Amino acid sequence: MRLVLTLLLVTLLCGCESVAFYAQAIGGQLNVMRAARPLDSWLADPQTTPELRARLESARRIRQFASRELALPENGSYASYADLRRPYVVWNVFAAPRFSVEAKPECFPFTGCVSYRGFFSEKLARAHAERLRGDGYDVHIAGVPAYSTLGWFDDPLLSTFILYPEVQLARLLFHELAHQVAYARDDTAFNESFAVVVEEEGVRRWLRAQGRTTELAAFRAAQARKREFAASVAQTRARLGQIYKSDATEQAKARQKAEEFVRLRAEYGNVVPTEANNAFLVSVAVYTQLVPGFERLLADSGGNLPAFYARVRELAASERSSRDTLLARRP
């Protein structure tokens, strides 16, 4: 009821297009909540498949580890499960001007401005993307398996990710729970990069605790590859930023822009889409841009997670310029 009343108030304060957006947000969140049933109910149900049963039991153990060993919130999140019967829970639409590497901000009354707009319907997401393209923006659509309500509600396990390999399931749960620890308004890169550092440290500790050394080595290798990709994206983004700020003609900028994306696709064609553009770079940067800074902060905290979280909460409440200086944010 709190969700409905809050969002209904928001719709009364917004224009027609915003009313439509919040209406789908209300409906989408309510559908997720209605579909959720306690884990014990699913585990006791004879119709639950052995594969799903095993994953739910694994998720419960991971959830317990998160609170017991990682000092992540101990609450009702991930104590229930919802079968959504679709591949993603939401579709995020990222947009950036044709000659800019900065995101078009999407601003909301309670969460502040973020670097994307999320839709519970792929059709609505694609329609919004087409409108943005018509206005001259670069656009990238990303299907999302999970999201956090920032502790406002008890987030359920979802069919969109429950069958992930166990390491990836743990990674996702640690990431989403981290969003309940600290949240900075108007700073998507801060929030997502922090959650990435928590998820990675969490998975390392989780694997070590079980003596799964082979999987730990594989995870470390995968993270190293991700760092290399993130570095290449950051370099491409930096070069494009300089190109866009230059006095070159739009024709010259467009040519150099195309060359940069050809180069990036040649290096990482397996993960860079054919239609990669400025918005795609934004979608990567928000999850990677500040990771090195948070890793340093964790090291400075001696690996003590509660101390690390306390420092991050202080930063989240501070002026953005102070955060940028400490985390050495790159363009």
Where are these regions (language model features)?
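Sec-dependent signal peptide recognition
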Residues: 2-7
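Bacterial signal peptide processing site
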Residues: 17-20
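Sec-exported extracytoplasmic/periplasmic mature domains
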Residues: 44-48, 57, 61-71, 178-182, ...
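Post-signal peptide N-terminal segment of mature Sec-exported envelope proteins
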Residues: 22-50
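Acidic/His-rich structured neighborhood in mature extracellular/periplasmic domains
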Residues: 61-226
